[in-house]
Protein backbone atom coordinates (compact mmCIF):
# COMPACT_ATOMS: atom_id res chain seq x y z
CA UNK A 1 0.00 0.00 0.00
CA UNK A 2 1.48 3.40 -0.94
CA UNK A 3 2.45 5.79 1.81
CA UNK A 4 0.14 8.80 2.17
CA UNK A 5 2.17 11.93 2.93
CA UNK A 6 -0.73 14.26 3.80
CA UNK A 7 0.17 14.48 7.51
CA UNK A 8 3.78 15.51 6.85
CA UNK A 9 4.37 19.28 6.94
CA UNK A 10 7.42 21.51 6.64
CA UNK A 11 7.54 21.57 10.45
CA UNK A 12 8.15 17.80 10.68
CA UNK A 13 10.76 17.95 7.94
CA UNK A 14 12.57 20.75 9.78
CA UNK A 15 12.33 18.73 13.01
CA UNK A 16 13.92 15.75 11.21
CA UNK A 17 16.71 18.03 9.93
CA UNK A 18 17.32 19.24 13.49
CA UNK A 19 17.41 15.62 14.69
CA UNK A 20 19.98 14.79 12.00
CA UNK A 21 22.12 17.76 13.06
CA UNK A 22 21.79 16.84 16.74
CA UNK A 23 22.62 13.14 16.37
CA UNK A 24 25.04 13.24 13.45
CA UNK A 25 24.70 10.97 10.42
CA UNK A 26 25.71 7.59 11.88
CA UNK A 27 23.49 7.77 14.96
CA UNK A 28 20.60 9.27 12.95
CA UNK A 29 20.72 6.41 10.43
CA UNK A 30 21.01 3.84 13.21
CA UNK A 31 18.12 5.25 15.25
CA UNK A 32 15.74 5.85 12.35
CA UNK A 33 16.60 2.88 10.13
CA UNK A 34 17.89 4.58 7.00
CA UNK A 35 21.15 4.72 5.05
CA UNK A 36 23.14 7.57 3.48
CA UNK A 37 21.85 8.99 0.22
CA UNK A 38 23.39 8.01 -3.09
CA UNK A 39 21.53 10.06 -5.70
CA UNK A 40 20.03 13.26 -4.24
CA UNK A 41 20.67 15.79 -1.49
CA UNK A 42 18.10 17.85 0.36
CA UNK A 43 19.66 21.31 0.61
CA UNK A 44 18.73 23.41 3.64
CA UNK A 45 20.60 26.36 5.12
CA UNK A 46 23.58 25.63 2.83
CA UNK A 47 23.89 22.09 4.21
CA UNK A 48 23.09 18.78 2.53
CA UNK A 49 20.88 16.06 3.97
CA UNK A 50 19.69 12.60 2.85
CA UNK A 51 16.19 13.28 1.49
CA UNK A 52 14.71 9.81 1.94
CA UNK A 53 15.94 9.50 5.54
CA UNK A 54 14.73 13.01 6.41
CA UNK A 55 11.30 12.45 4.87
CA UNK A 56 10.90 9.03 6.50
CA UNK A 57 11.79 10.49 9.88
CA UNK A 58 9.42 13.43 9.32
CA UNK A 59 6.67 10.88 8.60
CA UNK A 60 7.47 9.13 11.88
CA UNK A 61 7.26 12.46 13.74
CA UNK A 62 3.94 13.31 12.06
CA UNK A 63 2.19 9.95 12.44
CA UNK A 64 4.03 7.99 15.12
CA UNK A 65 4.58 5.21 12.55
CA UNK A 66 8.09 4.22 11.53
CA UNK A 67 8.74 3.52 7.86
CA UNK A 68 11.43 1.21 6.53
CA UNK A 69 13.54 2.38 3.61
CA UNK A 70 11.81 -0.14 1.34
CA UNK A 71 8.35 1.25 2.17
CA UNK A 72 8.69 4.19 -0.23
CA UNK A 73 10.71 5.54 -3.14
CA UNK A 74 13.46 8.06 -2.62
CA UNK A 75 13.90 9.34 -6.17
CA UNK A 76 12.09 11.80 -8.42
CA UNK A 77 8.69 10.14 -7.97
CA UNK A 78 9.10 9.62 -4.23
CA UNK A 79 10.86 11.62 -1.53
CA UNK A 80 12.22 14.20 -3.99
CA UNK A 81 8.70 14.98 -5.24
CA UNK A 82 7.14 15.14 -1.76
CA UNK A 83 9.88 17.40 -0.39
CA UNK A 84 9.62 19.65 -3.45
CA UNK A 85 5.87 20.07 -2.86
CA UNK A 86 6.68 21.15 0.71
CA UNK A 87 8.98 23.85 -0.66
CA UNK A 88 12.35 22.19 -0.11
CA UNK A 89 15.19 22.09 -2.62
CA UNK A 90 16.47 18.66 -3.60
CA UNK A 91 19.39 18.43 -6.01
CA UNK A 92 21.34 15.63 -7.65
CA UNK A 93 24.13 14.57 -5.33
CA UNK A 94 27.52 16.12 -6.03
CA UNK A 95 30.58 13.88 -5.83
CA UNK A 96 32.68 14.43 -2.71
CA UNK A 97 35.67 16.67 -3.33
Functional labels for PLM-detected ranges:
Residues 1-97:
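Intrinsically disordered, charged low-complexity linkers and terminal tails
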Amino acid sequence: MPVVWDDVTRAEVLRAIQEYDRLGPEKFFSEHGFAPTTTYDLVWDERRYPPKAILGTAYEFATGQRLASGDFEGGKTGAVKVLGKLGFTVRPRQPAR
